[in-house]
Amino acid sequence: MSVTSDTATGTGFTAAYAWTAEVDEAPVSVSAAGDLVAVAGAGGTVRVLHAAAGAPVDVFPLSEGLLHAALSPDAQHLVVAGPGGHALWRRADRRVRRALTGERSQAAAWSGTDRVAVAAGRRAVVLRPDGTHVWTTGPGAGAVTGVAWMRGGRWLAVAAYGEVRRHERHPAAPVATYPHTGSRLALALAPTGRWICSGNRDVPLRVWRTRDGDRLALSDAPEKVSRLVFDDTGRWLAADGTPHVTVWDFSGDGPAGSRPRTLLAPAAVTALAWRPGTRAHLASGGDDGTLCLWRAAAGRAGGSLRPAHRYALGAPVVALAWSGPGLLVAATREGRIAALRLPDGTRL
């Protein structure tokens, strides 16, 4: 892997790349936390880098390949998941604990720094950072495709074919089930714990209110949503699934009866990531290699927005991750990792 630095010229201003790197396999997932960035490659190589300069910290393999990576919030641990199982990495001594069970694992989510939920076939397993087992959900109807924590780690949402299940530690059976049709492609939970949202292959965007399990009727809901993410405040939800991106306002009683803002992306969207903070700044990547930055809450409901800034990365963007509000890390299908440093930490 080689690391260099240069500048990126976009519409509106010129921003410096903190660093760029080239890797020899296609990235599939990028995670950033604290002073680290983790890059998971399709061939099974995990690279842990310093966020500030891109210098390597560690490299290790997962023999069955990779689908997902997630750093703990304190950047002291990393979980990676793939077709044959998962692995946990510890920063203090670079120790890797592999659990190659043969069960497909394509999702993981941390609850604080002391617990991580990992998809394991038709179940989700909750572990300590050292790999110690805490509890396991009961099996669902199909393979688990998404996991997310709610209510400060008291609830765990697990998505699979035909349903999203909400679990508490005891019993292993779900305390609530939110049914849908077909395969789930994306799962997002509001930080407030009020909403569960699901993107699906066969039906439009689904939204449930956790208090009573009611499903909201949405106007202009996109179909085939595969990327779905709330901002830090829980007010704004971004979804792909159309030629563009829709942004939904979850303030008050939620988005039922309202229309979303439409972000006019220049090409099919392949990655979405909210900038940390409360200003509703969104980054999107496209299959034409374009990286866009958006003021996603500008204008009015039902209106259309164009990018505030655009950058050309030269190959389809496969993953985005923010390392704080001032550094955006993007990965392309051809193996380029680019860390873009924005000139101001709060404005866009």
Predicted regions and their residues:
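A short helix->beta-strand "capping" segment at the edge of beta-propeller domains
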Residues: S2-D24
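Conserved strand-to-loop turn within each blade of WD40 beta-propeller repeats
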Residues: A40-G43, A81-P83, A119-G121, A159-Y161, ...
